[in-house]
């Protein structure tokens, strides 16, 4: 990975990693990482065994519906959300600017260009796909809003890092429109401001 970065320039000013953090005025204690799995108790923190969690960070576990509801609650209240997700599915496409989970194998051929029914993702199926390594922690992105298609289906507007120009083989200015079923199945976790959590979740977690 190379040498540690000790100094860099941002908008014409030099920073160290520490001075840049101070400039942002972010208090890292204001944030929590939430997730949803069935192999650990709900509303407890635990260390998730994934390669990217090399620092042994804690995750708060909760039911799948509540996990998604907290993403919505954050966005509806003006907060954005950091996302850790699996992007290895053939139906995650930066080129097409969408990430979806088709209800049938046949629809995989056309779902990137046509609106098709999507899979009903249960907690049990999510857990199964994680345990058999079909879901892995591939990529970090940034959920900044929601959009709706012609049939009224909601998608999360996800800022990706694969470029923003059409010549870079991306669509939607580099954003990916990620369906709710995709998030239910393939979102490993999200980092969210404590103030953006739903009141019930705050109480259950004691934060």
At which residue positions do the language-model features occur?
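Active-site signature of cysteine proteases
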Residues: 1-207
């Amino acid at each position: 990975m190379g040498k540690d970065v000790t100094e860099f320039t941002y908008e014409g000013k030099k920073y160290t990693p520490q001075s840049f953090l101070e400039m942002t005025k972010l208090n890292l204690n204001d944030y929590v990482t939430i997730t949803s799995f069935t192999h650990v108790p709900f509303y407890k923190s635990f260390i998730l065994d994934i390669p990217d969690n090399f620092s042994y960070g804690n995750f708060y576990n909760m039911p799948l519906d509540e996990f998604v509801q907290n993403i919505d609650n954050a966005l509806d209240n003006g907060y954005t959300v950091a996302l850790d997700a699996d992007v290895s599915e053939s139906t995650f496409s930066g080129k097409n600017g969408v990430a979806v989970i088709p209800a049938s194998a046949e629809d995989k051929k056309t779902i990137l260009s046509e609106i098709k029914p999507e899979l009903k993702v249960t907690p049990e199926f999510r857990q199964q796909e994680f345990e058999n390594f079909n879901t892995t922690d591939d990529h970090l992105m940034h959920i900044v809003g929601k959009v709706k298609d012609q049939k009224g289906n909601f998608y999360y507007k996800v800022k990706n890092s694969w470029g923003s120009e059409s010549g870079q083989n991306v669509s939607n200015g580099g954003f990916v429109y990620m369906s709710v079923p995709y998030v239910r199945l393939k979102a490993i976790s999200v980092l969210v401001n404590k103030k953006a959590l739903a009141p019930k979740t705050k109480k259950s977690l004691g934060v």
